[in-house]
Structures are given as C-alpha cells and as structure tokens.
Amino acid sequence: MHELTGKDKLAFNKLQKRLRRQVGNAIVDYGMIRDGDKVMVCLSGGKDSYTMLDILMNLQRNAPVAFELVAVNLDQKQPGFPEHVLPEYLERVGVPYHIVERDTYSVVKEKTPEGKTTCALCSRLRRGTLYGFAEEIGANKVALGHHREDMLETLFLNMFFGGSLKSMPPKLLSDDGKHIVIRPLAYCREADIAEYAEWREFPIIPCNLCGSQPNLQRQVVKEMLTEWEEKHPGRLETMFKAITNVAPSQLADRAMFDFEGLEDKQRDFLARRIETFDVLAREA
C-alpha cells in the first residue's frame, strides 16, 4: 500500500475504523472468537477474504483475548491460477499459512452438466476439504469472508428458489458437529470492503471457474438488491436488521411456534387475569 496524504489518508482511516468496529461488534455480539481459539481463515484471493484476514490480524494485536490465526488457501487446480501470489503475500504480512492442493476443478467440470452452474458442487467440495483440513491442524473455528450483502442475497435465493426462509448465520455449528463456522464480516457492506481492498492494494485473484458464468441466480438477486438500494438508500440496512429481529409468532412455521397450543395459553392468560381481579377486589 502506497503512502496516503491529506484527504485520502482521512478517508482511508475513517473506512478502516468503520470496518474494524463492525467486525469487532460482530465478534462480540455472536461470541465468534474466545480466548485460546485457533481460527482458520479461509483465503480465496478475493477482496472479501483479504479484508477479513487483514482486520482479524489487527484485532489479534489489540483484542483482550489471545487467539491464533492461520490462513488457508484451497488450490483447486483451476487453469491459470497464479500459485505464487498468495504465498508471497502471506510471507510478506507474516501470518502462518497452508496451501491445500486438491483438484476439485476437474471433478466439478466432469460432474456438472453442460449449461449448468458449477457453484453448488464446487461449494460442497470446497467446504468438505476445508473442514477436513481444519480438523487436521486443530483449528476449532473456521472463518469465512461472507459480508452483509452475501447474507441478504442468500436469504432471497432461498425464498425465491428454495422455498425456505433462511440465510447465512454469522456463526454456526457444522452438520457433523465438529466445526464452528464464523463470518466476521457479517455487519460489513460490500462496497466498503471493495473500497478497502482497493486502498490496501491486495493482489486479487479472480475466480475463473464460477465468476464468469452468465445468468447466475445469485447475480440476478444481487442486481435486484443493488437496484433497490439505489432507488431507496438504506433499504439493505433495514433488511439486514430484519433478519436479526425475527418474530416466529408472526410467520407460519409450526416447528418454530406452537400455534396449536394458543388455546391453552389463552386459558392460562384469562385465568391469571381473573385471579388478579379477585386479588384486587379483596384488597379493595
């Protein structure tokens, strides 16, 4: 990163403080990192994971708890992948790291029918490999670089195409119960992350496997949300607040709320009211 002066320096410092504050708040709000944790930071070479690692390294130096960071990149053997970029960067910033080599690219290309997107299979293979490696190195937390917009996009993808009301939680336990996944950038705006990555001059590596695929459902949803935000500034922030303020009794999921038991609750409520009136009457 070149030296900044004047207004540029002020703008960068303001942005950096905002991102650090948001990451710190997310970590505290959801108990993402505790004393003694070993956090495996999944580094893809994109703007989000670079920003996540950069901010976590700063927090590590200033946090009231001691935790370990180790950066891990999964080399999926995509054609043209610049294998030297991440090791050189990680050596320069001085963080412990591993490069895990798995030819998931060939598997994805072989198994995905022509014209279909590779995202789902690629994601499953990548997740399985990273979870396994986290266990191998003794990492009890796996940090992913998803941000606020990723979470909102996933919410609408599941609503529109999956028939379910769910998103990406800031913190979750994996299905096998072995790994806790955290998303420290949960409160961060994608635009802020992109600007920060540009200021910091991270050596961005584009994804040649999925990033260029046309008509991705996620891209359609992203464009929809972008248009909403342009027409109604602040709408995405309001929508994000909504997923942190869920009222199960106002939805229709019988597993989340006991609708059949409302009559019992009504009887109990009326009985308590009658009892209260009787007490007041006796006191009078």
Swiss-Prot record:
Q: What is the name of the protein in this document?
A: tRNA-cytidine(32) 2-sulfurtransferase
**Substrates-to-products reaction catalysed:** cytidine(32) in tRNA + S-sulfanyl-L-cysteinyl-[cysteine desulfurase] + AH2 + ATP = 2-thiocytidine(32) in tRNA + L-cysteinyl-[cysteine desulfurase] + A + AMP + diphosphate + H(+)
Main localisation, per the record? Answer: cytoplasm
In terms of superkingdom, the source organism counts as Bacteria
Annotated GO CC locations:
cytoplasm
Q: What does this protein do?
A: Catalyzes the ATP-dependent 2-thiolation of cytidine in position 32 of tRNA, to form 2-thiocytidine (s(2)C32). The sulfur atoms are provided by the cysteine/cysteine desulfurase (IscS) system.
Which stretch carries the motif PP-loop motif?
Answer: 44-49
Q: Which PANTHER family match?
A: AMINOTRAN_5 DOMAIN-CONTAINING PROTEIN (PTHR43686:SF1), SULFURTRANSFERASE-RELATED (PTHR43686)
